[in-house]
Amino acid sequence: MAQDQGEKENPMRELRIRKLCLNICVGESGDRLTRAAKVLEQLTGQTPVFSKARYTVRSFGIRRNEKIAVHCTVRGAKAEEILEKGLKVREYELRKNNFSDTGNFGFGIQEHIDLGIKYDPSIGIYGLDFYVVLGRPGFSIADKKRRTGCIGAKHRISKEEAMRWFQQKYDGIILPGK
């Protein structure tokens, strides 16, 4: 009977965006970092979080526990909207290397003003990294605190599935790796 009406797709196998992580690494604390935080706040409408350096790197002039980057996690419809803007800047082209083995992908852009934010001379221009975490219904069992479950091997997302999803959803082009 299922073949008569055409193959129905299992709704639990449907891929979707779990979260979009945006990151601006300035490499120093101070005024440039607070301006980068303003850029992320303008883009997402959320308060960004500061990241600290793990260890001291004297050649870069970075001290341990010094705030050097700012990041923000966006979910839901807002994540899809921001991702659409970012992919438009990249002209919907990603490399095969941009996709991880766990089915996630990331890319960077050179200038935040390409996303449609008006240029402000007091803020300047910053590049930012996009990282997209894909998931399926049922992935939350691995994240819960009590009675944590494992995601089965057949339910995990492969690199090929993520690339196929990107091509179908955004009509994206995947270039060969470097």
Curated annotation (Swiss-Prot):
Which is an annotated GO molecular function term of this record? structural constituent of ribosome
What PROSITE patterns would the database entry show? RIBOSOMAL_L5
Q: What compartments host this protein?
A: Nucleus, Nucleolus; Cytoplasm
Q: Which InterPro entries match?
A: Ribosomal_uL5, Ribosomal_uL5_C, Ribosomal_uL5_CS, Ribosomal_uL5_dom_sf, Ribosomal_uL5_N
Phosphothreonine sites (modified residues): T44, T47
**GO CC term, one of those recorded:** extracellular exosome
Q: Name one GO biological process term.
A: negative regulation of proteasomal ubiquitin-dependent protein catabolic process
Claim: rRNA-binding is one of the keywords in the record? yes
Which parts of the sequence carry N-acetylalanine?
A2
Q: Which SUPFAM superfamilies match?
A: RL5-like
Residues with the modification N6-acetyllysine, per the entry, are K52, K85
Q: Where is this cross-link: Glycyl lysine isopeptide (Lys-Gly) (interchain with G-Cter in SUMO2)?
A: K38, K52, K154
Q: Which UniProt keywords apply?
A: Acetylation, Cytoplasm, Diamond-Blackfan anemia, Disease variant, Isopeptide bond, Nucleus, Phosphoprotein, Ribonucleoprotein, Ribosomal protein, RNA-binding, rRNA-binding, Ubl conjugation
Q: Which family does it belong to?
A: Belongs to the universal ribosomal protein uL5 family.
Role this protein plays:
Component of the ribosome, a large ribonucleoprotein complex responsible for the synthesis of proteins in the cell. The small ribosomal subunit (SSU) binds messenger RNAs (mRNAs) and translates the encoded message by selecting cognate aminoacyl-transfer RNA (tRNA) molecules. The large subunit (LSU) contains the ribosomal catalytic site termed the peptidyl transferase center (PTC), which catalyzes the formation of peptide bonds, thereby polymerizing the amino acids delivered by tRNAs into a polypeptide chain.
Assembly, in brief, is: Component of the large ribosomal subunit (LSU). Part of the 5S RNP complex, which is a LSU subcomplex composed of the 5S RNA, RPL5 and RPL11. Component of a hexameric 5S RNP precursor complex, composed of 5S RNA, RRS1, RPF2/BXDC1, RPL5, RPL11 and HEATR3; this complex acts as a precursor for ribosome assembly. Interacts with PML. Interacts with MDM2 (via its RanBP2-type zinc finger domain); negatively regulates MDM2-mediated TP53 ubiquitination and degradation. Interacts with NOP53; retains RPL11 into the nucleolus.
Disease annotation reads: Diamond-Blackfan anemia 7: A form of Diamond-Blackfan anemia, a congenital non-regenerative hypoplastic anemia that usually presents early in infancy. Diamond-Blackfan anemia is characterized by a moderate to severe macrocytic anemia, erythroblastopenia, and an increased risk of malignancy. 30 to 40% of Diamond-Blackfan anemia patients present with short stature and congenital anomalies, the most frequent being craniofacial (Pierre-Robin syndrome and cleft palate), thumb and urogenital anomalies.
Protein name per its UniProtKB record: Large ribosomal subunit protein uL5
